[in-house]
């Protein structure tokens, strides 16, 4: 299995990448042995872009899952969204993990020991059930503890490979789990998805203002990049006692939480998912929480959010 190199191994730390408009001319290029090669290379649109767009157009629905801050449960929500959509056995679901420096999807989906293999049709994603396929850099690393220390152009190259070289097999839904914030991975996704009919993004937050202030930036990014926002999800919204069913707020809500922010920004509010220790347990063991704990209040709310997203997408057709 080969990851295509887009940045020379002897390039300086802040190399803009050989396909960049600044290749060979940026200040970071001074003293690089490849400077003349990059400076004289032809400029223009990425030659792979038409193929990438064509592959994406074959997928009926494409959803980005975003968060402004790390640790709000974005990957957990991405996994439950994929599990929930896969309950319709006639639908094909793909889950693509582009959190390249911190891939957690393999563990959450229970396939952390698997390796991706190549066939005549391209890379084969890992199937967690007959209609749910997963792809992550975690399947390409020598061990779970291996770090990924990459510049932006190399991340861009891998995301491109995940789209054009993975045999996704006629997907109905592609869920893309992204890193927190607005990083190189997000810019690559915008470049690849903007001409392929992306359905939109689901933004995940927790109730406290320190998370909400970063979500405002994420919403601003989506609007500047012309990415529709399907709605806002408030995660870790209180704790429901499994014995008495009483609810306690873990995070102090000082500015109204996710629901108030959605109203302020003119966005659909999809729901509040309470804390449930069994969610973390399900993720650690690679199980579907909504299958393992169908009577949990959190499970019922997750299913309701998934139904809202699905209904919204069906209305857009």
Curated annotation (Swiss-Prot):
A Pfam entry, by short name: ParA
Family as reported in the entry's similarity comment: Belongs to the Mrp/NBP35 ATP-binding proteins family. NUBP1/NBP35 subfamily.
Membrane spanning residue stretches: none
Cofactor(s) this protein requires: [4Fe-4S] cluster
Alphabetical GO biological process terms: [4Fe-4S] cluster assembly; iron-sulfur cluster assembly
Entry keyword Membrane: no
Domain of life: Eukaryota
Keyword Nucleotide-binding appears in the UniProt entry: yes
Cofactor mode of binding and number, as noted: Binds 4 [4Fe-4S] clusters per heterotetramer. Contains two stable clusters in the N-termini of nbp35 and two labile, bridging clusters between subunits of the nbp35-cfd1 heterotetramer.
Organism annotation: Schizosaccharomyces pombe (strain 972 / ATCC 24843)
InterPro entries per record: Mrp-like_CS (IPR000808), Mrp/NBP35_ATP-bd (IPR019591), NUBP1/Nbp35 (IPR028601), P-loop_NTPase (IPR027417), YlxH/NBP35 (IPR033756)
Region of interest (Disordered), ranges: 1-27
Record's subunit section: Heterotetramer of 2 nbp35 and 2 cfd1 chains.
Name of the protein described by the UniProt record: Cytosolic Fe-S cluster assembly factor nbp35
Binding residue positions for [4Fe-4S] cluster 1: 15, 29, 32, 38
PANTHER family: CYTOSOLIC FE-S CLUSTER ASSEMBLY FACTOR NUBP1 (PTHR23264:SF35), NUCLEOTIDE-BINDING PROTEIN NBP35 YEAST -RELATED (PTHR23264)
Entry-linked SUPFAM superfamilies: P-loop containing nucleoside triphosphate hydrolases
Keywords: 4Fe-4S, ATP-binding, Cytoplasm, Iron, Iron-sulfur, Metal-binding, Nucleotide-binding
GO cellular component: cytosol; cytosolic [4Fe-4S] assembly scaffold complex; nucleus
UniProt-recorded Gene Ontology molecular function terms: 4 iron, 4 sulfur cluster binding; ATP binding; ATP hydrolysis activity; ATP-dependent FeS chaperone activity; iron-sulfur cluster binding; metal ion binding
């Amino acid at each position: 299995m080969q990851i295509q190199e887009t940045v020379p191994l002897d390039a300086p730390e802040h190399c803009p990448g050989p396909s960049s408009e600044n290749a060979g001319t940026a200040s970071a290029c001074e003293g690089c042995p490849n400077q003349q090669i990059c400076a004289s290379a032809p400029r223009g649109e990425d030659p792979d872009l038409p193929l990438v767009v064509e592959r994406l157009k074959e997928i009926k629905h494409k959803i980005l899952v975003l968060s402004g801050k790390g640790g709000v449960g974005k990957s957990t929500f991405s996994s439950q969204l994929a599990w929930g959509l896969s309950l319709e056995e006639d639908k094909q679901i793909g889950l693509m993990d582009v959190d390249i420096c911190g891939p957690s999807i393999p563990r959450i989906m229970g396939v952390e020991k698997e390796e991706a293999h190549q066939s005549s049709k391209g890379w084969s994603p890992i199937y967690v059930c007959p209609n749910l396929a997963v792809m992550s850099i975690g399947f390409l690393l020598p061990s779970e503890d291996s770090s990924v220390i990459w510049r932006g152009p190399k991340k861009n190259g891998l995301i491109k490979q995940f789209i054009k070289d993975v045999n996704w097999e006629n997907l109905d839904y592609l869920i893309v789990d992204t890193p927190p914030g607005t990083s190189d991975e997000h810019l690559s996704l915008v470049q690849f998805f903007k001409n392929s009919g992306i359905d939109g993004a689901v933004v995940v937050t927790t109730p406290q203002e320190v998370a909400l202030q970063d979500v405002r930036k994420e919403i601003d990014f989506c609007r500047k990049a012309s990415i529709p926002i399907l709605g806002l999800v408030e995660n870790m919204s209180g704790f429901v006692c499994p014995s008495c069913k009483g609810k306690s707020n873990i995070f102090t809500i000082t500015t109204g939480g996710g629901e108030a922010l959605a109203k302020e920004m003119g966005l659909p509010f999809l729901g509040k998912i309470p804390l449930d220790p069994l969610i973390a347990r399900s993720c650690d063991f690679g199980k579907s929480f909504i299958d393992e704990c169908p009577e949990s209040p959190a499970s019922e709310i997750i299913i309701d959010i998934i139904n809202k997203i699905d209904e919204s997408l069906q209305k857009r057709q």
